[in-house]
Amino acid sequence: TVQKINTETYEVTSLTNCPNATEMAYEDGKLFLFYAQWGMSSPAFLTFDTKSQSAGTSFITDGTSIQSPYSISAVGGNVYVAESDYKNNGDIYCFGGDGKLFKKFEAGLNPMKVVLAQKDNI
C-alpha cells in the first residue's frame, strides 16, 4: 500500500488507486514504478499521477523488454531502470520523457540507483 502524509496535519491516507509496486521513483507529481515478482513472466512498468490519483499506462512506449528490473530512478524528466540477475553485471536502461530508450549501458553487479550530479557555476 502506498501512503501519503499531509505535511501540515501529518494525516496519513492511502493512495488506493496506486498499483502494486516492487520499486518506485518520484518526480514532478508522478510515480514511476515497476512490479516484478519471482516467477512472473514479465514485469509491469507503470505510472501513477499523484495529483489526480490515477494509474497510467507503461512509461516504456517503444517495446523495450526488461526481464529482471532491480531499481528505478527518475531524474530530469528521464527514467532510469537498472536490471540485474544477481550474478552477472547489470544494465541501466535510460528512457526519455517520451518513453523511448535513448541509452543502455553496463553498470556492474546489482546496480542500485542512478544519481546525476549537476555542474554548478564553479
Go through the PLM ranges and name each one.
Residues 6-10, 48-54, 95-100:
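Short loop/turn segments that connect beta-strands within beta-propeller blades
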Residues 1-4, 40-47, 87-93:
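Structural motif
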Residues 15-16, 59, 105:
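Short hydrophobic alpha-helix segments
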Residues 1-32, 38:
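Acidic, serine/threonine- and glycine-rich low-complexity intrinsically disordered segments
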Residues 70-73, 81-92:
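Acidic, glycine-rich flexible loop segments
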Residues 35-38, 84-86:
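Short loop/turn segments immediately following the C-termini of beta-strands
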Residues 17-29, 65-75, 107-121:
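Repeated scaffold domains used in trafficking and secretory/extracellular systems
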Residues 30-34, 78-82:
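Conserved beta-propeller blade signature
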